[in-house]
């Protein structure tokens, strides 16, 4: 059963930036820490004169799949939506 939850809430992210690539390690949302095990997809959406990069992330320990967005202008992260893996 598909139970998508749209939230559009800010999150704190620990990521590794290298060679124009962003590797998300984990993020904090509502005082919970979510370890990112895998990134399934990445795409960019124009936003003003810059763009936002969106990621589909799998958090196996939390049984969650989610969409995260990174705004390259203000360097802020947002949790767009999430769902359970099962």
Regions found by a protein language model. Name each.
Residues 1-86:
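N- and C-terminal low-complexity/disordered segments
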């Amino acid at each position: 059963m598909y139970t998508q939850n749209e939230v559009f809430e800010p999150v704190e992210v620990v990521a590794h930036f290298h060679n124009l690539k962003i590797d998300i390690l984990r993020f904090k949302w509502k005082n919970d820490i979510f370890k990112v095990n895998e990134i399934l997809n990445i795409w960019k959406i124009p936003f003003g004169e810059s763009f936002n990069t969106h990621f589909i992330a799998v958090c196996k320990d939390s049984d969650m799949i989610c969409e995260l967005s990174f705004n390259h202008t203000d360097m802020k992260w947002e949790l767009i939506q999430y769902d359970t893996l099962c």
